[in-house]
Amino acid sequence: GVKYEHRTSRAGDPHVHSHVLLANKQLCRDGRVRSLDGVSLYHEARAAGMVYQATVREILSQKLGVEFGDVVNGCAEIVGLDDPELIASYSTRAREIDQWQADNGLETRAAYERIAQKITRRTKDTDTPLEELETEWARAEHGAQVREFVAGLVPNNEAPARAVGEDFLPKPSQILSAVVAERSTFTRADVAEKAAELIRPGAVSPEDMTVTVEGLVDAALGTRGTWSVTPEKSRELDNTQREGSQKYTTVEVVDEVERGVDMATARVERGVTAESIQPVEGELSPAQADAMRAVVGSDYLASVVVAPAGAGKTSSLKAAHKAWNQAGKHVVGLAPTGKAADVMVGENVADESMTIARAFVGTDELTPEHTAAKLGWNRDTVVVVDEAGMVSNPDTIRVLETATAAGARVVFVGDPEQYSAVKARSGMLATLSHELPDAVELREVFRQRDAGEREASKWLRGGEEADVSRAAEWYMRHERLHAGSVTAMMDDALAGWREDTAAGKQS
């Protein structure tokens, strides 16, 4: 491969970083030339980036004597250069991206940020000499502060190397705790990411960083509390395994899931009469009515409604809400995001609603009984959790614990095939949809008028390679796909979105 060292961002700000290009073809031991497996390589890219960042921190600590703050997502600010105003003054690209989102009336979201990065991307200036750029940076608003900081640095390159030992390296339990805080199952690369994040400057020499990380990963995966959840195959017998195909979990994660299943499947006999839920032409299909009668009349503490996009979730929950109200029940809506929570009352699927974070704020030290009392939950409460696939496992457990203490019922609504919780272990919805005997799924798609398009949406949802290809072929045949430059397509999409929203449509 070839490594390129860059010192600036596309906007000409100081931004030291590296690019590595690997040849797609490699000469193998048997003399044959083969292509690299791009999927496996891509899977390892983030872990490699974390090791790179840890190595850079170590080099800067030795060569310049700088200290670093807490590591967040693999990166850490230099202590003394972590003033937000200083960072912002040298972050022209970030300001350009924020300004583009503001100019287009878009809220700050990662998806919009990625679009803005592409649309506002400029050609990098490679003509201006580094000396001229450094002079320009020194004259900037915070240039004097930076010069003063640099002048006070004392290099550590002559200091004796610190011995590597248990006192200076993260323990396997620390690494695994950091991993499972974000995911229920994980790969070797996931463990490598966290191991590199947790290595403090001064503990490992730059030359030994990679081998040290590999050793920490071996130790973490070799603990008694780590379980393999996929069959292990010998590379000598089967060399077709891709990186990341081997998945692991921990005893703590399994125990948490089992506890959630035990609570959800407890028989509480809080079901109510659901005779009022009947099919209505154009509003509620027979299958939707059957599903809601099963949910409303269920004797289990929890119910699950698997609801793919466009399957009539709102109209179904409206019917259930009416039946609960007729039985004297109060329906509380919970959701992982404010946007999802806000529409629950407006769409008449709940009597009140809030985010899960707001519901449980300030309750960390309370017992489930006290939390239930604080929220006003009791035997006449039905808690409907929307977008449940995006709810973390710990939050799901808290909802179940509180409902159990209150004698309330819980209904989890969502699609296990859609996005999971952000940076938090999840997957409980999928598990409960299999474990609850009366879990229901809304299988009909109503959002699209064209029957073929409804079927294509199901193929995309499943995510299997063959099904995705079938969906893409359908979209291509029916002129749903348009080609062009990334910028042009994004501009067209944004223009279409503006036109729809200006007309009061959902887009």
Give residue spans per PLM region.
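Hydrophobic residues in beta-strands of the RecA-like P-loop NTPase core, especially within AAA+ ATPase
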Residues: 385, 413-414
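Conserved RecA-like ASCE P-loop NTPase motor core of nucleic-acid helicases/translocases
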Residues: 303-348, 411-413, 478-486, 493-507
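Beta->alpha loop/short-helix hinge microenvironment recognizer with preference
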Residues: 1-301, 306-311, 315, 320-326, ...
